[in-house]
From Swiss-Prot:
One term of GO molecular function: magnesium ion binding
Cofactor info, note text: Binds 1 Mg(2+) ion per subunit.
Swiss-Prot/TrEMBL cofactor(s): Mg(2+)
Gene: rhmA
Protein's recorded name: 2-keto-3-deoxy-L-rhamnonate aldolase
Residues the entry annotates as binding Mg(2+): 153, 179
Gene Ontology cellular component list: cytoplasm
Amino acid sequence: MNALLSNPFKEGLRKGDTQIGLWLSSTTSYMAEIAATSGYDWLLIDGEHAPNTVQDLYHQLQAIAPYASQPVIRPIEGSKALIKQVLDIGAQTLLIPMVDTAEQARQVVSATRYPPLGQRGVGASVARAARWGRIDNYMAQANESLCLLVQVESKVALENLDAILEVEGIDGVFIGPADLSASLGYPDNAGHPEVQRIIESCIYRIRAAGKAAGFLAVDPAMAQKCLAWGANFVAVGVDTMLYTEALDSRLAMFKSVQSVSTAKRSY
């Protein structure tokens, strides 16, 4: 099978395109497919905070596959064994949470590449990613088409940002606003002026280093700020939050209810 692996999301980052995404936390392939028909450039399937199993991730990749939206998987952690499974089910773009040091970044790079570039385990004959052994020269193509994003979301990571940006094999750095603001002493307050200043500075440093800069902003005004600061892959909502907002707003049309605010500004 002479198929060529391509990764439109990675190609867009290389060109500097602005790509707008949506966070998927509902854990269902049905909701993933609905989102894929909306036209977002990328869809983040969350395995860190949403209760997704590897098989759940697999089914959502299948649901998104017929559409133009590009899937990004965030596993619960950056362990070598888990990364191997997630890549084998067909993920081409990974977002690895809680990367605090350059050494962690190097370990993740190694886990995502086949030898001699890394230590990814070989099992193409049983992998959806290789069409069960039918893609010629799969290992080399996989190394080339893989897109690796890491999350910087702590004070320690901020201190090590420049070193992380120097790690070869990292395509982009994503600022995790919720954990970052908590680490800086402003829990649930990513809109604090000091946090905003740091986010803007980080985006500038990431782009200056030749990497893509990413962000999740559930507040449209914050999303626009990040785009203006230079972030080029930005998620502008979370499916479960949009669903609860819609439910609450519709109920409020007919009943006087007390519910959570529909204008939550942080993840």
